């Protein structure tokens, strides 16, 4: 897979030289090309932003350097005989990233990322890009970051680990949270007893069918408590009647726990009260 990343901070992506992603790049499974947006400016100050039309706070990224950079990305793809890459624009206004989306991106031969900063990228850049390539605006969550770089790192790792040959044991990818529409259950390793806490006996039994059943039940319970909407989104018949009962029991238990107030004066109680916080006023896309 080819990945192009456009940013004013290309050094932000040094982590892609590490761990599984770095090894995948060294083996040629993943090819990452960084583009410095400022290389496509034509003034002494290498300006990439300006004040917004209509007024308002902050600055907006100018269209000219973005247009030239994306033209260069498409030209490189054409030189290698590849259709224009799928352009992903990280932004809090985009569609939420999911495991299904990561799987879809992993099937693409070429991805490009446009990392915005400040108040974002001039909208005409995306309008123009859509004339030549597919464009998807993607959010990694309902919060705001200072720029699109961190979100791009998240998306690249989520996608790259799905490529054949990146993860040593590909079966582990199939057991991940969200891979089957459920959160992954708890994991344990040696020693069997640590600080008085024991590994569940079933995991020591050697009974593979019982272990698989226990893991699925734990995944269902955890999903029911932490992300019940994922269970609601499963296709009809995905859960057996027994599993549906487990999920209902877990939800009921979680609801009762939430309704039980903490003891007076306990840490985190309303009487103690955490200090107030205010949301960040940083304004760009992730």
Curated annotation (Swiss-Prot):
It catalyses: guanosine(37) in tRNA + S-adenosyl-L-methionine = N(1)-methylguanosine(37) in tRNA + S-adenosyl-L-homocysteine + H(+). InterPro entries: Alpha/beta_knot_MTases (IPR029028), tRNA_m1G_MeTrfase_C_sf (IPR023148), tRNA_m1G_MeTrfase_TrmD (IPR002649), tRNA_m1G_MTases_N (IPR029026), tRNA_MeTrfase_TRMD/TRM10 (IPR016009). It is found in: Cytoplasm. Its EC number is 2.1.1.228. S-adenosyl-L-methionine binds at residues 116, 140-145. One of its GO terms (biological process) is tRNA N1-guanine methylation. Pfam families: tRNA_m1G_MT. GO terms for molecular function: tRNA (guanine(37)-N1)-methyltransferase activity. Keywords: Cytoplasm, Methyltransferase, S-adenosyl-L-methionine, Transferase, tRNA processing. Homodimer. Belongs to the RNA methyltransferase TrmD family. Specifically methylates guanosine-37 in various tRNAs. PANTHER family: TRNA (GUANINE-N(1)-)-METHYLTRANSFERASE. This is tRNA (guanine-N(1)-)-methyltransferase. It comes from Acidothermus cellulolyticus (strain ATCC 43068 / DSM 8971 / 11B).
């Amino acid at each position: 897979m080819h990945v192009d990343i456009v940013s004013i901070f290309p050094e932000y992506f040094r982590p892609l030289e590490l761990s599984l992603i770095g090894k995948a790049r060294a083996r040629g499974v993943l090819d990452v090309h960084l583009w410095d947006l400022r290389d496509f400016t034509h003034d002494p100050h290498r300006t990439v932003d300006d004040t917004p039309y209509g007024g308002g706070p902050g600055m907006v990224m100018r269209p000219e350097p973005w247009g030239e950079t994306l033209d260069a990305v498409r030209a490189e793809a054409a030189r290698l005989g590849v259709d224009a890459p799928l352009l992903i624009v990280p932004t809090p206004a985009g569609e939420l990233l999911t495991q299904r989306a990561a799987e879809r991106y992993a099937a693409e031969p070429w991805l490009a990322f446009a990392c915005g900063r400040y108040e974002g990228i001039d909208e005409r850049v995306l309008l123009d890009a859509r004339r030549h390539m597919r464009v998807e605006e993607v959010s990694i969550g309902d919060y705001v970051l200072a720029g699109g770089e961190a979100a791009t790192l998240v998306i690249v790792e989520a996608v790259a680990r799905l490529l054949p040959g990146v993860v040593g044991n590909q079966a582990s990818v199939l057991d991940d949270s969200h891979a089957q529409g459920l959160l992954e259950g708890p994991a344990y390793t040696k020693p069997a007893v640590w600080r008085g806490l024991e590994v569940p006996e079933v995991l020591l039994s050697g009974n593979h069918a019982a272990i698989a059943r226990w893991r699925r039940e734990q995944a269902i319970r955890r999903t029911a408590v932490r992300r019940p909407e994922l269970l609601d989104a499963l296709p009809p018949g995905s859960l057996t009647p027994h599993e549906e009962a487990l999920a209902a029991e877990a939800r009921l238990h979680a609801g009762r726990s939430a309704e039980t107030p903490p003891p007076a004066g306990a840490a985190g109680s309303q009487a103690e009260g955490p200090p107030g916080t205010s949301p960040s006023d940083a304004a760009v896309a992730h």
